[in-house]
């Protein structure tokens, strides 16, 4: 009973203040506008309670998002695939042409459980390494990185990674391009570095 009372108080307070210090990541609105212009339908699935999720999406994105599902009574939360499959059905989409984009391990696991292609965004709350380990098929480091995935498809990076590690190369994932540059600078400082040789696309695992 105390938990129910606290939850009701929280929802009442959050309902009045949920826009405080809340704003879209820079570049997201532009990406959504481009997707809409190109006929891509967007839905949102959140573990935030349903009325709040709908209010936030409507306020910040309007008709750029077609459907929003939040937490609903008697419906399991992510990473259970029930809600995302319901959302996909309502949108009239199919698994083969749908990208599930998220910023957490829970999102990646939801995509895997639903049989969808998982795209991890590394500007959120989890590292690129965690997103990849949780099932991300590809990573985006800034919002504009998402657009080529819709236009050209998602490369199977795991094949390239497997091929490269087989040739003695190592893989590191970074949250930002600046982190990658800093890593290379620190690793190579004071060392003589040379590179040579070549690999075919087939050797990298691409057809």
Regions found by a protein language model. Give the residues of each.
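The feature marks the mature, well-folded catalytic cores of soluble enzymes
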Residues: 156-207
């Amino acid at each position: 009973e105390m938990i129910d009372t606290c939850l009701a108080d929280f929802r009442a307070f959050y309902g009045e203040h949920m826009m405080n210090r809340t704003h879209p990541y820079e570049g997201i609105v532009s990406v959504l506008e481009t997707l809409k212009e190109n006929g891509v339908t967007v839905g949102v699935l959140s573990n935030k309670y349903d009325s709040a999720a709908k209010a936030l999406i409507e306020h910040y994105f309007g008709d750029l998002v077609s459907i929003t599902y939040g937490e609903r009574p008697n419906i399991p939360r992510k990473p259970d695939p029930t809600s995302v499959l319901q959302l996909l059905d309502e949108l009239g989409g199919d698994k083969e042409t749908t990208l599930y984009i998220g910023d957490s391990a829970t999102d990646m696991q939801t995509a895997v459980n639903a049989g969808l292609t998982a795209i991890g965004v590394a500007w959120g709350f989890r590292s690129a390494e965690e997103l990849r380990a949780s099932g991300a098929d590809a990573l985006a480091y800034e919002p504009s990185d998402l657009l080529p995935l819709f236009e050209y498809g998602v490369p199977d990076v795991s094949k390239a990674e497997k091929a490269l590690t087989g040739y003695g190369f190592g893989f590191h994932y970074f949250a930002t391009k600046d982190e990658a540059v800093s890593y290379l600078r620190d690793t190579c400082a004071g060392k003589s570095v040379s590179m040579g040789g070549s690999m075919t696309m087939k050797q990298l695992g691409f057809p």
